[in-house]
C-alpha cells in the first residue's frame, strides 16, 4: 500500500493514471483513472450549483456507479454526501432530508417519484436525475482535463452524514470527516487484510457505513476493484461472485441468514471468495457459510459513530468479538460508572452472572474521536458523558479477557427482576432450521414489568408448528427460564431497515396487533404456544386496564 493520506480527496488523486479496474458492473467497467475523472466532473457540477449554507448533497440511488462517482466528486469539491435511505417513506423521509440541509438531491426517475409530494424545501432545479439525458450533458460539460486539488480541503472537512439504522429508535445523522474515513481505510486494511489485488463485492447499501468504511474506503486506499450489484440478492450472490471473481464482501447478519436459506449446491465452494466482514451474524450461520463457501468471515464490532474498540484474536471462543483494543475499552454500569465483573460462562457459553457482568461498552479515551451528530446536541450529550464515549451497546468480558457484544442498550429486557439480552435470545432462535431472521424485544406485562416477545421470519408461516417450536426451545440448554418468548409473531417478511437489519421498534409498536399470526405461551413450565384470536388479544389488553397499566399500551 502507498503512503497513508489524510483525506479522501488526496487518496483519489493517487488513483489518477491508475489503469487497474476501479469499478465494475455487469454492464460496464471503469479504470481507477476513469473513476477519478468521472468524480471530478461531478464535483465540478456540485461546485457550479453551490449556494450559501452547508455544502450537503443528498444521494438517493441504489448501488450504482453514479453513487460512487458522487462520493468521489463530493470529496474533491469539499462537499458532504448524505446517503438517503430508500426504505424511508412519507413524513419520515421528508423530515430526514430537511433535517440535513441538502442543497442538491441526486437521484433517478424512480427515486424522484418516491419524493413526489414531499416538501423538501428545494426547487425542481435542485434535483439531478442521473437517467435524464440533460444530466448526461451537464456532466459532460463539466469534464475536467486535469483535476486540481482544492487547498481548502483537509482532514477536518465534513465528508459524510450517515443516518443511523434506527432499529430501536429515531435515526440520527452521524458526522464523518474525510480524515476519519481515511484513517478507517488504513486501519481496516491492516485489520482485514485488504490488498490491491482484491476484487470487492459491494452488496450492502452505499448509504450505510458498512459498505463505505469496511469496503469502499479500503478499496480506494489500495486501488482494489469495487463490483456493484444494484442491491443485495441471496440468489444472485454466488453468480455475481463468480462473474466478477470477487475475493471480499461485507454483510450484516440478516443478509447472511438469507444466503444460508438458499438451497445448498454441490459446487458452492467453486468460487473465488477469500474473506468477508460483517456484524451480528449468528454463530451457526457463520459456521455454515465457511463450510459451504470456503471463505473466512471476520465478525466485527463497530458503528457509524465510532470503531476500533476491538482487537481480533484467532483464539477467541465462538461468539466473542476479540479482545478490548486497549485498557480504555471497558464494560461499566451506566448509572454508577463502576466497571462490571468478569462474566462466568457455562459450557454452552451462557452468562451465569448477567446482572453483575453485562453493562454498557465505553471508551474512556474515545470522546475526542467522536465527531458528533448533525444538529443534535442532546444525542451528542448522551454519547459523551463524564469525558467518556458511551457506545449505547451492551457487552461483557469473560474471565479470559475476551469481549462480547450483548445487544443494543434498548434491547435489555427486564423480566421478574432479572435482565435478559434480546440478542442472546435471537441467537438461540436462529438455530431453528426454519427461522430465517428474528427480532426479540420487550412488550409490557399487564401486571408488572415486561415480557419477552419474538418475531420470526419463515418461508411459509402456514407451515409453522407451535408444538415443534416449543419442543425446540425446551431443548436449548442455554435458554434461561425468563428468556423464552411469551409471544411469538410468525411472518413471511419482517420489516427491515435499508441496511437489512430487523426494524424492532416497528415490531415493538405493533406488538400482537398485526396481521401476522401471533402465538402466546400458555400454562406454566414447559413451553406451549397457542395462536391468539382477536378476542383473546382484546381480553389481554383489558387486563392492562384492570391493573391500571393501560398507558403502557400506548408507549
From Swiss-Prot:
InterPro entries found in the cross-reference section: AMP-bd_C, AMP-bd_C_sf, AMP-binding_CS, AMP-dep_synth/lig_dom, ANL_N_sf
UniProt keyword Ligase, yes or no: yes
Induction entry: Up-regulated on cholate.
BP terms from Gene Ontology: long-chain fatty acid import into cell; steroid metabolic process
Pathway involvement of the protein, from the record: Steroid metabolism
Cited function: Involved in cholate catabolism. Catalyzes the ATP-dependent formation of CoA thioesters of steroids with isopropanoyl side chains, likely occurring as degradation intermediates. Can use 4-BNC, HSBNC and HIDP as substrate.
Protein name per UniProt: Steroid-22-oyl-CoA synthetase
This protein's encoding gene: casI
